Amino acid sequence: MGTAAVGDYWNHNTAYHPWLVGIAAEHRGDVLDVGCGDGLLAERLAPVSRSVTGIEPDPATADRAVERVTDLDDVQISRTSFEEFDPGTRRFDLVTFVASLHHMDLRTSLARARDMLAPSGEIAVVGLWANGSAWDWVWSACCLPAVMVGDRLHRDTPDIGVTIAEPRESLRAIRRTTAEVLPGAVIRRKLYYRYLLRWSS
C-alpha cells in the first residue's frame, strides 16, 4: 500500500470536506474527528474550530496525522480506536465520521457519538453503504458517468495509504438503525458512492 505525502489531495471522501467545514463553522467549537486518517480534515477544521481532536487507531496513519498538524496548537491526534477513546468530562460540539463508521459497529458508534455531544451538538457522517437493493445498483450505475468526470477533473487520489474496509450495511439498514439511535437524523444519498448523515442533539 502506498503512502501519500503530506499535502492536499482530492478523492471521494475529501469531496465532502467543505460540507463538514461548513457545519464546524456554524459551531466554532470543539470537534471530534473519528477515524481521522492522515489528518487532512482535522487540518481543515482547525481554522473554524476552538479545538479539534482526531482519533486514529492505525499507528502509522496516526503518525502521518501528527506530522500534518504538528504546527497547529489546537489540534490533537489520539492513537486509539473510538471504542477505547476516553473523553473524560469533555463534550464536543461536532463529531465527524468520514469513511470510518463502516469500520465499526453502527449502532454502538452512533450511540457513543451521541453521548459525547455538548448541548446543541451535532453528528455529521460521510459514509459508505453496500448495495442491497435494485435501486442501489441503479443509482450507482447512473452516477458512474458523473463520478468518472469528477475523478478526472479533480485528479482523484484514491489510495492515500490508509486502512480501508468494504461497507456491510445497505443504506436501508443504515437508515433504520440511525432512526432508532438518532431520531430525526437526515440521511442523503450522494455522488461518489457516499451518503451524508446529519443529526442535532
Mark where each language-model region is:
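A short, conserved alpha-helix within the catalytic core of class I
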Residues: 104-113
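Conserved beta-strand signature within the Rossmann-like core of class I S-adenosyl-L-methionine
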Residues: 120-127
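C-terminal alpha-helical "lid/dimerization" subdomain adjacent to the S-adenosyl-L-methionine
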Residues: 129-177
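Conserved Class I S-adenosyl-L-methionine
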Residues: 164-201
